[in-house]
């Protein structure tokens, strides 16, 4: 797995180094590797690419009238600490300063990119970004009721809960790895394969570190470490039960319910430590089916 990942890293570096790559292609490539959670493999290449993207204020991007492209450039530059003015979105507004419905409402992909990019506002004076959020959200809601399809409907739903710039990078990459190959255009098979391999390699590393921590702390073997963690879970439940019994009566009952329900959710998602149903949703299939589809006996 490691050898294949290293080979793919070399192939992706070639994409960054391609002399014919335009500033727009560079921005899209950076966005893809960041979104898929493999940007740590290409820090130098990303820095070089972003310099060309940043310097292209009046070039390709200056004449570009594609909302998705302009929003992606805005997002990746601000994510990496490079200043770009919110005025770049003025071309999508009418004479009254409002975002143009005729230009944008039929472009849900662009609206989602605008919605996420606008959450990179840095001052209250950037009112255009506040307007962008309100405009994009209202029209994306309409699109979700109508023509929006998977995987975009899931991406919009996540962004409404927590906008992309504020969402957990690890969790978003997990979702996006499953969605990237379904996109109608622009996906790269080698980048996707690398993202999958890197995700598994990092997860394996985390599991190994967890075993090593328990082994170092308590002198336990790998199997003993997992058993110890399972025992910690049992003890945590006992402490939760005790805390609920001893909770101040003045405490809102809803708070007690929320604490216990959160713990229950974690227990179900990870199925008592036996399977990871958060990463692999199929592990919850039988439970969800029994809860929502099967009639009571």
UniProtKB/Swiss-Prot annotation:
Cellular component terms per the entry's GO annotation: cytoplasm
Residue ranges crossing the lipid bilayer per the database entry: none
Compartment(s) of residence: Cytoplasm
InterPro entries: Isoprenoid_synthase_dom_sf (IPR008949), Terpene_synth_N (IPR001906), Terpene_synth_N_sf (IPR036965), Terpene_synthase-like (IPR050148), Terpenoid_cyclase/PrenylTrfase (IPR008930)
SUPFAM superfamilies linked to this entry: Terpenoid cyclases/Protein prenyltransferases, Terpenoid synthases
Keywords: Cytoplasm
GO annotation (BP), single: terpenoid biosynthetic process
Pfam families: Terpene_synth (PF01397)
Chief location: cytoplasm
Protein name: Inactive beta selinene synthase
Origin organism lineage: Eukaryota, Viridiplantae, Streptophyta, Embryophyta, Tracheophyta
């Amino acid at each position: 797995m490691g050898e294949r990942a290293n080979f793919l890293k070399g192939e992706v570096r070639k994409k960054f180094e391609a002399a014919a790559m335009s500033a727009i292609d560079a921005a899209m490539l950076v966005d893809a590797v960041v979104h898929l959670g493999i940007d740590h493999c290409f820090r130098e290449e990303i820095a070089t690419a972003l310099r060309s993207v940043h310097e292209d204020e009046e070039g390709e991007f200056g004449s570009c009238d594609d909302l998705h492209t302009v929003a992606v450039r805005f997002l990746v530059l601000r994510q990496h600490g490079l200043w770009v003015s919110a005025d770049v979105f003025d071309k999508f507004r009418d004479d009254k300063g409002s975002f143009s419905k005729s230009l944008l409402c039929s472009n849900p992909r662009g609206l989602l990119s605008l919605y996420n990019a606008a959450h990179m506002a840095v001052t209250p004076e950037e009112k255009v970004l506040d307007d962008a959020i309100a405009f994009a959200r209202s029209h994306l809601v309409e699109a979700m009721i109508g023509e929006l399809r998977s995987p975009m409907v899931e991406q919009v739903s996540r962004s409404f809960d927590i906008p992309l710039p504020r969402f957990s990078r690890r969790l978003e990459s997990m979702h996006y790895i499953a969605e990237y190959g379904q996109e109608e255009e622009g996906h790269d098979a080698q980048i996707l394969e690398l993202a999958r391999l890197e995700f598994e390699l990092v997860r394996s590393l985390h599991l190994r570190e967890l075993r090593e921590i328990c082994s170092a702390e308590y002198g336990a073997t790998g199997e003993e470490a997992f058993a110890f963690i399972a025992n910690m879970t049992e003890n945590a439940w006992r402490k939760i039960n005790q805390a609920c019994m001893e909770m101040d009566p003045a405490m809102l009952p809803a708070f007690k319910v929320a604490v216990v329900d959160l713990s229950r959710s974690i227990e179900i998602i990870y199925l008592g430590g036996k399977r990871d149903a958060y990463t692999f949703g199929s592990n919850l299939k039988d439970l969800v089916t029994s809860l929502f589809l099967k009639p009571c006996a």
